[in-house]
């Protein structure tokens, strides 16, 4: 390092300590005032009052009327017939014919089995979406890697 670069580094180092407010990190919670937080809370309460609860059954006609009103300002899209709740025979996979909707327990069981199959698939166990292969092995030995459970000894 030459004398000019040493002086420059020293000057920048001193400048960093001279103005800590402009260079240092500021916490996020100071950026919003209590009045702003109260406004957000009131807005959230207002939206919760306007939204129907999940337990209440909303008729499909009311939903289609709401979507028609909301979509009036958008560009015209081709009309899609509303879903009637019926499942095609190809989707039933051997279920009894004549049933128009799936029961909640059947849907949850189907979703659980698909999720379990996805999580236990060998391909998903080999992949790491966090690091490259070499960095993943280094991180696993230090206990900081994404798949550190696979490489423990």
UniProtKB/Swiss-Prot annotation:
The region called Important for degradation of atrial natriuretic peptide by IDE is annotated at 147-151
Question: Which GO annotations describe the biological process of this protein?
Answer: cGMP biosynthetic process; cGMP-mediated signaling; female pregnancy; negative regulation of systemic arterial blood pressure; neuropeptide signaling pathway; receptor guanylyl cyclase signaling pathway; regulation of blood pressure; vasodilation
Q: InterPro entries under this entry?
A: Natr_peptide, Natr_peptide_CS, Natriuretic_peptide, Natriuretic_peptide_atrial
Instruction: From the UniProt entry, list the residue stretches annotated as the region Disordered.
Output: 54-101
Q: Which residues carry this modification: Phosphoserine?
A: 129
* SMART domains named in the record: NAT_PEP (SM00183)
**Site, Cleavage: residue positions:** 123-124, 130-131
Q: Which residues form the propeptide?
A: 26-123, 93-103
Q: Which domain of life is it from?
A: Eukaryota
Keywords assigned by UniProt, alphabetized? Cell projection, Disulfide bond, Hormone, Phosphoprotein, Secreted, Signal, Vasoactive, Vasodilator
One example of the protein's molecular function in GO is: hormone activity
Instruction: Write one Pfam family the protein is assigned to.
Output: ANP
> Any S-S bridges, and between which cysteines?
130-146
The answer to whether the entry has keyword Metal-binding is no
User: What is the name of this protein?
Assistant: Natriuretic peptides A
Organism, per UniProt? Oryctolagus cuniculus (Rabbit)
What gene is it encoded by?
A: NPPA
